[in-house]
Amino acid sequence: MILTNWGYTLTGVDTLPDILTEDEFNIMTANKFAGDVRIASELKASQSGIRSYVGWHLAGNLACECKYRGMDKRISLTKGGTVIQVQLPARYVTDVDNITVDGNVVEKYYIESNGVLHIANVGIVSDWSEIVIDYQAGLSDAMAEASKELMAHHVTHSLSNSYGIQSESSGGVSVTYSAAWIQNVMSSKLSDSDKEILAPYRLEGMF
């Protein structure tokens, strides 16, 4: 069980899975940097930057639990407090396992693709009411490839820059990096194009 940085608990794991492991990175880069002691720290920095931007764990499907109070700014009460709209801290919610309001199980709900959960027939909810939601959220293997490729790109260029490399060629294609671009390369830093790639994964709900 892990309490994440995003206000919810991962209930089925003891450690948060990596988006991209060092072995996967070495395979994706044909072992170009294999044995470099900086790979682990660069992967960690890139992963931290990506997860901070998207606002959730961005990994394979994991069991999650999130707790709210009626006064929480991430929820909205409608129809006299008998219907709750909750912004779950996740994209790609694959299942809702259990919902309780003040200990009472609620079975009528609807989940939107952006992680907004609508819960009906909950009775009167006060500011101090406790809402507990157990759900599954995460990416399929195919969907996870974009984040893996982005991390590999970041770490590759960060390591290349630290070696003083200003141009590379592969498969007949040559790329030269501008001085300004090189100066701003960091594994944790996201460019505008990176943010476009991550847009489908970023938490953007009702609030």
Segments (PLM) and residue ranges:
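Divalent metal-cofactor coordination and adjacent catalytic microenvironments
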Residues: 1-207
